[in-house]
Structure formats: structure tokens, C-alpha cells
């Protein structure tokens, strides 16, 4: 089964979730987002990832095997630009480079990479053996995020610091709310990390790690994953952006949402 889901988004058509899950549809603008499943196969987040969730609620929601999840990134094509949103873990199992190749893209072809935050499963694909993987890419990272990781002890931030150093000549630090190349808007989604950022293009909202367990957190945004660095801010961002997406009829794409990797 092909692991890349292609959706061409239409600004003039309103379609049901079921239709979106099974069809591609075209627009005048031809904005396309593709799901890249970096770690193949089923993935589940266990109860220990959400320690504040009562046992009774966990069982009521039927999470016997855990909450369905994934490890993913996205390829966005819009306004003549091809943009990679996060780069996965960069481990031996990583499907990023093979999936880009299926789309006819070599690492040196990529010109734009937008990073939601500096955790290893989002920036690992930027380096191989400590060297640049995407030599011609301009890398965009929230300024608060970059500065926060620079200030952390090395035992927590060595990988992030390495990425920032190796890509320093191609690094662009933006402020939340800035419009990035391709008409992509950056949106503050702070809490999971200090400068965690979502990205919006038309009715696409890429939410990064806003949700680690969509089947739980879409209904109960007040529950955080243990990975969320600022628990209060993370819950507030999750609640705000879910509301924002619903009010504006946006489709959310997340790096840990299960297949088909998007949700209304």
C-alpha cells in the first residue's frame, strides 16, 4: 500500500471528511500536501504518555493497545514552491528520502524546509553523520524556539545545537505570525516546546506535535503528553488551535496523527 497520501486542496469546494479521506480534488491554486510516514507501520502511544488521564476514561475510550499515532512529516507544494515540513527522525528506518525520491525529489533539490520545533524526531533528517542532508535548503525556525534550545544544557540540546550550527548559513529565524515563502503563515503553538509553531496555507493547518493522541486529545485537549515541556501552555495552545481550525473550516495535519494523518 502506498504510504504517501496526496490531497489537492480546493478553496471553492466544501467536502466531507469521508470524501477527503478517499479522494484527491483540484483547485485553481493547486496547493498540494503529501503525507510522508517517516516510521512505517502501526504506532501507538501508551497510557504512560498521558499520565493525567484517569484509568476509567482511558478504558472508556477503548485504548487497549494505546492511542493510534505515527511519526511523520509533510511535503507542501504551493505557489510554485516545494516545502518540506519537518524531517523526521533520520534513523535507519526513515522513509523520508525514499518517499521524496518517489516524488522525483533529491535532497539537493529541496529549497525550503519549515521546522515546527527542535525535537529529534522532527530535525533528525536534517543531518547524516553530522553533515548536511539538504545542502541547498533554506531552513526556517521560530526565533523563540532556536534561542530556547541554545540556552539549554548540552545534555538536552546537543542535536538541536548541531543543526543550528551546521545550517547557520541557511538559517532563517522568524517570529510567530510572520508570512513565510509560499504564502505560509506561522502560528504560535507554544507549550510542547518554547517556540513550537503551526503552519497554515489556505485550509491546511500543519500542527506539529499539538496532539500526540488525536483520538484522546481532540475530545479532551486539556490532557497533555508527557513530552509537553510547558503543560499549561500546551493545553491552552491545543484548545485554541482546535477551536481555530473548526471555526475556520481548516483541516489539521499532525506529525503524530494516525493514518490518514489529517482531521477536521
Locate the predicted segments by residue.
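Metallo-beta-lactamase
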Residues: 4, 18-95, 109, 135-188, 203-209, 233-249
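Hydrophobic h-region of N-terminal signal peptides that target proteins for export
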Residues: 10-17
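Short acidic/His/Gly/Ser-rich catalytic and metal-binding motifs that mark active-site loops
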Residues: 44, 148-150, 214-218
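Cap/insert and terminal regions of metallo-dependent hydrolase folds
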Residues: 194, 203-264
Amino acid at each position: 500500500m502506498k504510504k504517501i497520501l496526496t490531497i489537492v486542496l480546493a478553496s471553492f469546494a466544501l467536502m466531507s471528511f469521508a470524501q477527503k479521506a478517499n479522494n484527491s480534488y483540484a483547485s485553481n491554486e493547486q496547493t498540494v500536501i503529501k503525507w510522508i510516514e517517516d516510521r512505517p507501520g502501526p504506532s501507538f502511544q501508551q497510557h504512560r504518555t498521558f499520565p493525567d488521564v484517569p484509568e476509567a476514561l482511558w478504558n472508556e475510550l477503548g485504548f487497549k493497545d494505546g492511542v493510534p499515532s505515527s511519526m511523520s512529516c509533510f511535503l507542501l507544494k504551493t505557489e510554485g514552491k516545494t516545502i518540506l515540513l519537518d524531517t523526521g527522525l533520520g534513523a535507519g528506518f526513515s522513509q523520508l528520502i525514499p518517499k521524496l525520491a518517489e516524488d522525483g525529489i533529491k535532497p539537493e533539490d529541496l529549497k525550503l524546509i519549515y521546522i515546527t520545533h527542535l525535537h529529534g524526531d522532527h530535525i533528525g533528517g536534517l543531518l547524516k553523520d553530522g553533515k548536511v542532508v539538504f545542502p541547498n535548503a533554506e531552513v526556517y525556525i521560530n526565533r523563540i524556539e532556536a534561542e530556547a534550545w541554545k540556552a539549554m544544557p548540552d545534555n538536552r540540546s546537543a542535536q538541536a545545537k548541531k543543526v543550528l550550527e551546521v545550517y547557520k548559513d541557511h538559517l532563517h529565524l522568524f517570529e510567530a505570525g510572520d508570512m513565510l515563502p509560499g504564502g505560509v503563515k506561522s502560528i504560535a503553538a507554544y507549550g510542547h516546546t518554547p517556540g513550537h509553531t503551526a503552519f497554515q496555507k489556505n485550509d491546511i493547518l500543519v500542527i506539529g506535535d499539538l496532539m500526540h493522541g488525536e483520538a484522546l486529545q481532540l475530545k479532551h485537549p486539556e490532557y497533555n503528553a508527557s513530552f509537553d515541556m510547558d503543560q499549561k501552555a500546551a493545553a491552552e495552545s491545543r484548545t485554541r488551535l482546535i477551536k481555530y481550525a473548526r471555526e475556520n473550516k481548516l483541516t489539521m495535519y499532525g506529525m503524530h496523527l494516525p493514518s490518514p494523518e489529517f482531521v477536521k
